[in-house]
Amino acid sequence: MPLNIEDKKAVVAEVSAQVAKAQTIVVAEYRGIAVGDLTKLRATARQQGVYLRVLKNTLARRAVEGTPFAGLAEQMTGPLIYGISEDAVASAKVLNDFAKTNDKLVLRAGSYDGKVLDVNAVKALASIPSRDELIAQLLGVMQAPVSGFARLLGALAAKKSEGAPAEAEAPAA
């Protein structure tokens, strides 16, 4: 059933609000995907904080008009699903991971930081760890020396308590 003009304006406003907050948009062709698979994709996207939507391309073009993603309008042809995310890699990661397991989803293009990305660039973006993963790695690197030092102090304390108390009180040279 076609949308009336008010519904179209509402859709454009909703998508424009998402685009205004977004860092990345990824576009993929979805011909022939089963409803169950598409439902799984939407659930995964929701968990990752990705706004996933099937839109008429004309409405999508209007939503990105005047934004850093306007260059993506040329790629908006055919049956497309749009992944929009505030996290720079989340939408690329969700759609790329799904495309690996479902050959009917074909990545077409993306846009990040005002630049239009081709398929290989979207895949490269998807391979970058997310912000949360990077923070976890950084904390792990920062925590390792502290943990090692704490274990060393614990081992020294245990050795001192086992050793003769006279050695501990010996004058330093």
From Swiss-Prot:
Query: What InterPro entries does the database record attribute to this sequence?
Result: Ribosomal_uL10, Ribosomal_uL10-like_sf, Ribosomal_uL10_bac, Ribosomal_uL10_bac_type
Q: State a single Gene Ontology molecular function.
A: large ribosomal subunit rRNA binding
Q: Which cysteines are joined by disulfide bonds?
A: none
Q: Which UniProt keywords apply?
A: Ribonucleoprotein, Ribosomal protein, RNA-binding, rRNA-binding
Q: Which residues cross the membrane?
A: none
* GO BP, sorted A to Z: translation
- Which Pfam family name is an example for this entry? Ribosomal_L10
GO terms for cellular component? ribonucleoprotein complex; ribosome
Q: Which domain of life is it from?
A: Bacteria
To which protein family does this belong? Belongs to the universal ribosomal protein uL10 family.
Q: Which NCBIfam families does the record cross-reference, listed alphabetically?
A: PRK00099.1-1
Q: What does this protein do?
A: Forms part of the ribosomal stalk, playing a central role in the interaction of the ribosome with GTP-bound translation factors.
Q: How does this chain assemble?
A: Part of the ribosomal stalk of the 50S ribosomal subunit. The N-terminus interacts with L11 and the large rRNA to form the base of the stalk. The C-terminus forms an elongated spine to which L12 dimers bind in a sequential fashion forming a multimeric L10(L12)X complex.
Protein name (record): Large ribosomal subunit protein uL10
Q: Which organism is it from?
A: Cupriavidus pinatubonensis (strain JMP 134 / LMG 1197) (Cupriavidus necator (strain JMP 134))
Taxonomy of the source species: Bacteria, Pseudomonadati, Pseudomonadota, Betaproteobacteria, Burkholderiales
